[in-house]
Amino acid sequence: RDRSVSRGLGDVYKRQLQYLVPSNFFAVSSLRKAAEILTEVNKETSLAKECTDLAAEVEAALKKYATYNHPEFGTIYAFEVDGFGNHLLMDDANVPSLLAMPYLGDVDVNDPIYQNTRRFVWSGSNPYFFKGKAGEGIGGPHIGYDMVWPMSIMMKAFTSQNDEEIKICIKMLMDTDAGTGFMHESFHKDDPTNFTRAWFAWQNTLFGELILKLVNEGKVDLLNSL
């Protein structure tokens, strides 16, 4: 149902196809959360049913149209589709993204299609995955080629079930702050001093959330080992 012409927050880059898959997944989970609030708090059962009905309709469409059988990674979620068999295979660092779907509660982290998608987006098969001397991660057309968004590295850590992978992500984030002590919007894959937005509250807040999550999960030793 999400057919707006632009992509993520602040991104005026127009879509190539009509339906942005991660945003539609997010719509499904958001509609169900709204229905719960409407039912339990507002006692608006009729409106709540409209939300759950729409969520079910969009979910059915995603199951039918949002996947693609990739020759290397198996069945994955496409980034954009048009419902006529065309798929755009990529991911963008902006959240909602394919990588971030379990973080947002849109899919289970153990969903096999998600795990295939996760491997795809963190590879050279994703045209907006960049790897260089300073670090690696996903960027997007909002900033341009070779610029890694720390947000993507955070989302990899948020959705990881491997402590060593999480440790690598956090170290990379710490090593690419250009000595400023802050997360930036993006940094050049070969030179972290070439960055955009010296102060980007969204990224800084997410980094704090990631550290707090690890502390709450009893992984202080992991953090202390960095």
For each predicted feature, which ranges?
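Inter-helical turn/loop segments and adjacent helix faces that build the functional surface
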Residues: K33-T52
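Aromatic- and histidine-enriched alpha-helix N-cap/loop-to-helix transition segments
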Residues: Q18-S29, D92-P96, Y145-S152, A198-E209
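C-terminal amphipathic alpha-helical segment
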Residues: N86-D111
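A short, mixed-charge helix-start or loop-turn motif at secondary-structure junctions
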Residues: K14-L17, T193
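Non-catalytic carbohydrate-binding regions of carbohydrate-active enzymes
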Residues: S46-F84, G105-L206, K213-L226
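Conserved small-residue packing positions in alpha-helical repeats and bundles
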Residues: A35, L99-P102, M154-M155, G208
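Single conserved hydrophobic/aromatic residue that forms the stacking wall/gate
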Residues: D2-L9, Y13
